[in-house]
A protein has these predicted regions:
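ABC ATPase nucleotide-binding domain helical subdomain, centered on the C-loop/LSGGQ "ABC signature"
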Residues: 4, 11, 29-70, 114, ...
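A short, proline-enriched helix->beta-strand linker immediately N-terminal to the Walker B motif
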Residues: 90-94, 123
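Conserved D-loop/post-Walker B switch-helix segment of ABC ATPase nucleotide-binding domains
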Residues: 106-116
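Catalytic Walker B motif of ABC-type/P-loop ATPase nucleotide-binding domains
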Residues: 96-100
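ABC-fold ATPase nucleotide-binding domain signature/coupling loops
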Residues: 2, 54-83, 101, 105-108, ...
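C-terminal portion of ABC ATPase nucleotide-binding domains
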Residues: 59-63, 115, 119, 123, ...
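ABC nucleotide-binding domain signature
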Residues: 8, 14-19, 127
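Hydrophobic anchor residue at the start of the ABC signature
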Residues: 85, 129
């Protein structure tokens, strides 16, 4: 059971990126390497490219040495999320959890990050919690929750054919585009 696993073991094997990530009053680089301080710069660049934040960082006057301020106040919501994704990837855990962690980025950036993560995901089990069908539809298994209960599961095509809640959300979101 999960309660029998030591917290240290969980922390060392799971990386979580929250919708509202916490950033420290340090530089961008220090925020990314906080759990892996001895990382060489090329590894840092690699994970920032996957999270599509590298170009934004390079536009800052001080680049990776840019201070982010208290709780990351100098960064936009999407930039904070992408820095947190880079930090999680750098930790190299076998389990990654993204809890609506792309909600503050536009759909094109969301698509580019998911595309970049495909290669990385071969080395880790990835759980993505999202309200965006475009983010969920390529998953091997989609679990639909309603009021905290599992009501449907399957891949995108299976869930569309079931004509349940997933299909209703899909119809609403595709009409909005």
């Amino acid at each position: 059971e999960l309660k029998d696993i030591q917290k240290n073991c969980l922390r060392n094997n799971i990386s979580i990126v929250l919708q509202e990530p916490f950033l420290f009053s340090k530089t961008i680089k220090e925020n990314i390497t906080i759990t892996n301080k001895d990382t060489d710069f090329e590894e840092v660049r690699s994970v920032t490219r996957i999270s599509h934040i590298d170009d934004s960082i390079n536009k800052f006057k001080d680049g990776y040495d840019t201070p982010v301020g208290e709780k990351g106040t100098t960064l936009s919501g999407g930039q904070k999320q992408r820095v947190a994704i880079a930090r999680a990837l750098l930790k190299k855990t076998p389990i990654l959890i993204f809890d609506d962690s792309l909600s503050a980025v536009d759909t094109e950036t969301d698509f580019q990050i998911r595309k970049s993560l495909k290669e990385y995901e071969k080395e880790a089990t990835t759980l993505i919690i999202t309200h965006r069908i475009s983010t969920a539809k390529d998953a091997d298994l989609i679990i639909v929750l309603d009021d905290g209960k599992i009501i449907e599961s399957g891949n995108h095509n299976e869930l569309i054919s079931k004509d349940g809640l997933y299909k209703k959300i899909y119809d609403i979101q595709t009409k909005m585009v």
